[in-house]
């Protein structure tokens, strides 16, 4: 009768240790080591993603590089200056602008 009582108490403890990975396997390797090796082997490699600043346009060209080239070409002037100067020049040629207000 005492043997059954010990087995009744011992079997759940051994099972609990094996489930938690604190027990050892046949050849002395711990369950946790085996699990961690398998987990890292199955882990997918991270996908390298481009940041939003390095996104590409429809032609597959890098937008940041293109913007740097455009700004260098413009001399770091905003786009509105070019468009505004063209508009003023056209209006001046047509005689629609007052020369005192727009020198």
Curated annotation (Swiss-Prot):
Its cofactor is Ca(2+); Mg(2+). Residues 34-83 are annotated as: Disordered. Expressed by the venom duct. Residues 1-21 form the signal peptide. One of its GO terms (cellular component) is extracellular region. The modification 4-carboxyglutamate is found at residues 82-83, 89. It is found in: Secreted. Residues 22-79 form a propeptide. Conantokins inhibit N-methyl-D-aspartate (NMDA) receptors. This toxin has the highest potency for the NR2B/GRIN2B subunit (IC(50)=0.11 uM), followed by NR2D/GRIN2D (IC(50)=0.48 uM), NR2A/GRIN2A (IC(50)=2.1 uM), and NR2C/GRIN2C (IC(50)=6.1 uM) subunits when tested on rat receptors. Belongs to the conotoxin B superfamily. The mature peptide does not contain cysteine residue. This is Conantokin R1-A.
